[in-house]
């Protein structure tokens, strides 16, 4: 069921929407329960795009009714196994960010400068949830090596100076349209910054 059909069904067939979400939730929870039983699995990566540039794809009320209860149970299962959950979600989640944190997500990935720069995310929520990535994909894909280095350093100065709660990385999933030299520049600048900021460590 695509977004358009889902949106109509929310009005015309709410029982169908509830049944679909319940079944998807059951399958997801069963998969996650098996995954966290494996010793080598230390974290669950939940990729679930909830938003677009201006807000959530559906209203927060819809998410609270149909989606968040399954998130809550998933997080309970993973945390009971002593493991972590990273949420990867694109879009503007400002209206639901506090709720996602209260549900218990350990980390959040996928940030875009034109929506909300990662520095602002870290300033507002970095004391409650780990922030991963944030070097904007547009800079990585179209910027020069120097621009990538400058942006990487700016992100680190704002988000990593305390040494906790932030992990350097791309703003979204690494893609084959990022020039290799730009990706390497981001990593190299991160290592340089760490050596300068935390001398005597292996970071």
What are these language model-derived features?
Residues 1-203:
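Active-site loop segments of alpha/beta catalytic cores
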């Amino acid at each position: 069921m695509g977004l358009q059909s889902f949106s109509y069904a929310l009005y015309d067939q709410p029982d169908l929407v509830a049944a679909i979400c319940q079944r998807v939730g059951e399958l997801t929870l069963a998969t996650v329960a098996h995954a966290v039983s494996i010793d080598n699995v230390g974290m669950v990566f939940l990729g679930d795009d909830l938003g677009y540039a201006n807000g959530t794809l559906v209203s927060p009320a819809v998410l609270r009714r149909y989606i968040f209860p399954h998130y809550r149970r998933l997080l309970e299962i993973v945390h009971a196994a002593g493991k972590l959950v990273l949420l990867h979600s694109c879009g503007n989640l400002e209206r639901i960010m506090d709720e996602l944190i209260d549900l218990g997500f350990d980390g959040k990935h996928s940030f875009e400068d034109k929506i909300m720069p990662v520095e602002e995310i870290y300033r507002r929520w970095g004391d409650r949830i780990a922030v991963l990535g944030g070097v904007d994909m547009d800079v990585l894909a179209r910027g020069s090596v120097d621009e990538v280095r400058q942006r990487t350093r700016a992100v680190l100065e704002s988000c990593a100076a305390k040494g906790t709660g932030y992990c350097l990385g791309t703003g979204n999933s690494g893609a084959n349209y990022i020039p290799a030299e730009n990706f390497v520049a981001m990593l190299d600048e991160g290592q340089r910054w760490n050596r300068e900021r935390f001398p005597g460590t292996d970071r």
